[in-house]
Curated annotation (Swiss-Prot):
The lineage of its organism: Bacteria, Bacillati, Actinomycetota, Actinomycetes, Mycobacteriales. One of its GO terms (molecular function) is magnesium ion binding. Keywords: Amino-acid biosynthesis, ATP-binding, Cytoplasm, Glycosyltransferase, Histidine biosynthesis, Magnesium, Metal-binding, Nucleotide-binding, Transferase. It comes from Nocardia farcinica (strain IFM 10152). This is ATP phosphoribosyltransferase. It is an enzyme of class 2 (transferase). It is found in: Cytoplasm.
Length: 283
């Protein structure tokens, strides 16, 4: 029985649960449930604090886990990424009061508040900067105003929270984070149940990044159309009743869907349809 950790709440939880559901795994019906057994797929899911997931996986108690890259790195647990999942993207940066030009070197001998002390200490050591790192469990932005810290290191999304507290981010990004599937370093990658779950999740993540495009194309324009929609290996081309036309099907990156459709229409293609895909394999 495969044992998999899933975030029990927060920004990562909803997306992780959605991906697993799309991959064909059982969902919990009550948010208070701490575990869900999926006997059909031989998997048991455990709903844990995102910050603790890498620790459980790294200890070998659980086989796989979904958490944030920043949380996994900060845990110090012996885990490695198996898949990047494409949701919950954020950056982890230093921030300090606005009104002056800050450099990372200015943090020398300063107090830095953060919920990710190991990540910050690792970066400071790499830079040769000595500073006091103060661990807080949340709301680190207010720590400067309350006189607890001189600067902070935190997850930055839109930057709205920083602006509300008159803070400005500076320096290089410490970590570009997103939801990731992690496993213990040295895990057995020949395990069938493990590889099946990875393949299913990978198929859902891939499907979220692509659209299936179908269109009719004059035969004399096919070569030009294929240049616009090369697909992964090659597009599917099928004959139509009208011998002067063919039907073409190809995967296109979701972010380019509309521009590709515009180019095909300008070329002379007809009946251009874009369809969502839910999952795929062997890509």
């Amino acid at each position: 029985m495969l044992r998999v950790a899933v975030p029990n709440k927060g920004a990562l939880s909803e997306s992780a649960t959605s991906i697993l559901s799309e991959a064909g795994y059982r969902k919990r019906t009550d948010s208070r449930d701490l575990s869900v057994l999926d006997p059909e797929n031989q998997v048991e899911f455990y709903f844990l604090r995102p910050k603790d997931i890498a620790v459980y996986v790294g200890s070998g108690e659980l086989d796989l886990g979904i958490t944030g890259r920043d949380l996994a790195l900060d845990s110090g647990a012996p885990v490695q990424e198996r898949l990047a999942l494409g949701f919950g993207r954020s950056t982890f940066r230093y921030a300090a009061p606005a009104g002056r030009e800050w450099k990372v070197e200015d943090l020398y001998d300063k107090r830095i508040a953060t919920s990710y002390p190991n990540l910050v200490l690792s970066d400071l050591r790499r830079r040769g900067i000595e500073a006091e790192v103060i661990r807080l469990d949340g709301a680190v932005e207010i720590s400067i105003q309350l006189g607890v810290a001189d600067a902070i290191a935190d997850v930055v999304g839109s930057g709205r929270t920083l602006r509300q507290h008159n803070l400005v981010a500076f320096g290089e990004t410490l970590c570009d984070s997103e939801g990731v599937l992690v496993e213990r370093v040295g895990a057995d990658r020949d395990d069938r149940a493990r590889n099946q779950l990875v393949a299913r999740i990978q198929g859902v993540v891939f499907a979220q990044q692509y659209l299936m495009l179908d269109y009719d194309c004059p035969k004399e324009l096919l070569d030009q159309a294929v240049q616009i929609t090369p697909g992964l290996e090659s597009p599917t081309v099928s004959p139509l009743a009208d011998e002067g036309w063919v039907a073409v099907r190809a995967l296109v990156p979701r972010g380019k869907g509309n521009s590709v459709m515009d180019r095909l229409a300008d070329l002379g293609a007809k009946a251009i349809l874009a369809t969502d895909i839910r999952s795929c394999r062997a890509f």
